[in-house]
């Protein structure tokens, strides 16, 4: 038995809400995956702020129809589709999917759409991999913090070196005067 019009409306609103929070959507072909495998994929994606939605292409088509940023996704809506809606860590989500794909060997990435404001860009698997290879937000923050810390450390050493140099110079002059006096 099919879903009622009301339940489809609820699903459609959930999809629209999820899409509005996502910055990237990856579309995968999930044919052949078991419920346990899909649950495993969801578990791997959860720490990256990504949700996996399995829904009919027609419902996803209706959900993206009102948002021009997701329009490029229309070309990916065919066959059995699962949608990986990435809210936070794009690189981490792609790596988690790649790890799952390597384990299951049953899924295929059709592509993705990166939403930038009101525009969306269709991405191939190679382009998604290039994005995933970029450092994560946490790694960039750590690199910047490390650079700032290094500058502060060098500055502190330089400031401490001035009095130490002065003390060594005074000591050298005092020793010189002692030698001359003796």
Swiss-Prot record:
Q: Which organism is this protein's natural source?
A: Microcystis aeruginosa (strain NIES-843 / IAM M-2473)
Alphabetical keyword list: Ribonucleoprotein, Ribosomal protein, RNA-binding, rRNA-binding
Q: Which InterPro entries match?
A: Ribosomal_uL10, Ribosomal_uL10-like_sf, Ribosomal_uL10_bac, Ribosomal_uL10_bac_type, Ribosomal_uL10_CS_bac
Provide the function of this protein: Forms part of the ribosomal stalk, playing a central role in the interaction of the ribosome with GTP-bound translation factors.
**Would the keyword Ribonucleoprotein turn up in this protein's UniProt record?**
yes
Quaternary structure, from the entry: Part of the ribosomal stalk of the 50S ribosomal subunit. The N-terminus interacts with L11 and the large rRNA to form the base of the stalk. The C-terminus forms an elongated spine to which L12 dimers bind in a sequential fashion forming a multimeric L10(L12)X complex.
Q: Which domain of life is it from?
A: Bacteria
Gene designation: rplJ
GO annotation, biological process: translation
Q: Which GO terms describe its cellular component?
A: large ribosomal subunit
| UniProt xrefs under Pfam families | Ribosomal_L10
Q: Name one GO molecular function term.
A: large ribosomal subunit rRNA binding
Task: Name it.
Answer: Large ribosomal subunit protein uL10
The family line of this record is: Belongs to the universal ribosomal protein uL10 family.
């Amino acid at each position: 038995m099919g879903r009622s019009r009301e339940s489809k409306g609820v699903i459609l609103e959930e999809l629209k809400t999820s899409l509005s929070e996502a910055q990237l959507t990856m579309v995968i072909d999930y044919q052949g995956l078991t419920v346990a495998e899909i649950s495993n994929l969801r578990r791997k994606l959860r720490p990256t702020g990504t949700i996996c939605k399995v829904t009919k292409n027609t419902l996803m088509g209706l959900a993206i129809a009102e948002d021009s940023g997701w329009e490029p996704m229309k070309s990916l809506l065919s066959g059995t589709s699962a949608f990986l809606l990435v809210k936070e860590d794009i690189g981490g989500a792609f790596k988690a999917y790649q790890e799952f794909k390597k384990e299951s060997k049953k899924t295929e990435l059709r592509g993705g759409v990166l939403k930038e404001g009101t525009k969306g860009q269709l991405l191939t698997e190679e382009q998604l991999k290039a994005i995933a290879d970029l450092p994560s937000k946490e790694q960039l923050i750590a690199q910047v913090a490390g650079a700032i810390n290094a500058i502060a450390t060098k500055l502190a050493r330089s400031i401490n070196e001035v009095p130490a140099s002065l003390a060594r110079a005074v000591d050298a002059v005092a020793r010189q005067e002692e030698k001359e006096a003796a």
